[in-house]
Amino acid sequence: MLKQVEIFTDGSCLGNPGPGGYGAIMRYGKHEKIFSAGFRLTTNNRMEMMAAIVALEALTQPCAVVLSTDSQYVRQGITSWIHNWKKRGWKTTDKKPVKNVDLWKRLDAALSHHDITWKWVKGHAGHVENERCDELARNAAGNPTLDDVGYTSEA
């Protein structure tokens, strides 16, 4: 039987593009792990994705994961859009390169060993874990220490 894990995520960007950060909380039973980092120049969507990626990549064995995000971009991208992007060689319907393809590929790989249920939560609506992740992300964005090497101005 797979371990049951809950992951809560949020991303933040001051300027979009601008300094950004992510926050994630991973919960297994009574155990909780916090993830957070800030980047000097990035976008909100990239930080939303990084929150999910970092938490999923921290799992050391296949798990049943309920991942809560307030990002429709991440939830729709991974549950709907990604299948056709992959079929088209990571191109959109109008044959343009998919934005943030480096992170979509990384997220896709991070999901491959797990049974994932995606849950959308309304941001800034009093959801306790989402509010905590938002605070982690905003604090990280306010003190960026990393370079987002995959960020390009077209992303």
UniProtKB/Swiss-Prot annotation:
GO terms for biological process: DNA replication, removal of RNA primer. Binds 1 Mg(2+) ion per subunit. May bind a second metal ion at a regulatory site, or after substrate binding. Mg(2+) 1 binds at residues 10, 48, 70. It is an enzyme of class 3 (hydrolase). Its EC number is 3.1.26.4. Residues 1-142 form the RNase H type-1 domain. GO terms for molecular function: magnesium ion binding; nucleic acid binding; RNA-DNA hybrid ribonuclease activity. GO terms for cellular component: cytoplasm. Mg(2+) 2 binds at residues 10, 134. The keyword Metal-binding applies. Keywords: Cytoplasm, Endonuclease, Hydrolase, Magnesium, Metal-binding, Nuclease. Its cofactor is Mg(2+). Endonuclease that specifically degrades the RNA of RNA-DNA hybrids. Monomer. Belongs to the RNase H family. This is Ribonuclease H. It comes from Erwinia tasmaniensis (strain DSM 17950 / CFBP 7177 / CIP 109463 / NCPPB 4357 / Et1/99).
